[in-house]
């Protein structure tokens, strides 16, 4: 709010690793990108893959084609494979960061929610639709991510109530839930 009053753009970053779930954020990206009050960036990153004998207990990352998929959006490559170095998100001075998925275990330390939340507000739009009772909501609301977010965008009033119940169970009371629909169905 203060930035727009001072004619400063609001910096929003989409941290993306999985082209298959982009439709859950695509319309959100489009709306923000077309609004002159926002400076929107996509940072394409690789993801940890489960390895035999190690599971996810390692620091090896593999691309799911993110860099190529978001190239037409002018994405920033978040990982230099030759130097094995991560792009510093802080260089973009983010006000808000959207993650495609809520799984800290699959990201490098610098991109884990507890580190990003120190300098930006984390927003989350679920990548999967919860058909009541199918267990998706419980799977996609890990406590170690939920405690760091500022905004959780829910698909309907029932979903909003269920998310608030999960937040109460986790003893988290500072996340704002907002009913917005399910962006994957916007098109």
Segments from the language model and where they lie:
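Active-site and donor-binding regions of nucleotide-sugar-utilizing enzymes
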Residues: 10-186
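Non-catalytic membrane-proximal stalk/linker segments that position and tether the catalytic domains
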Residues: 1-11
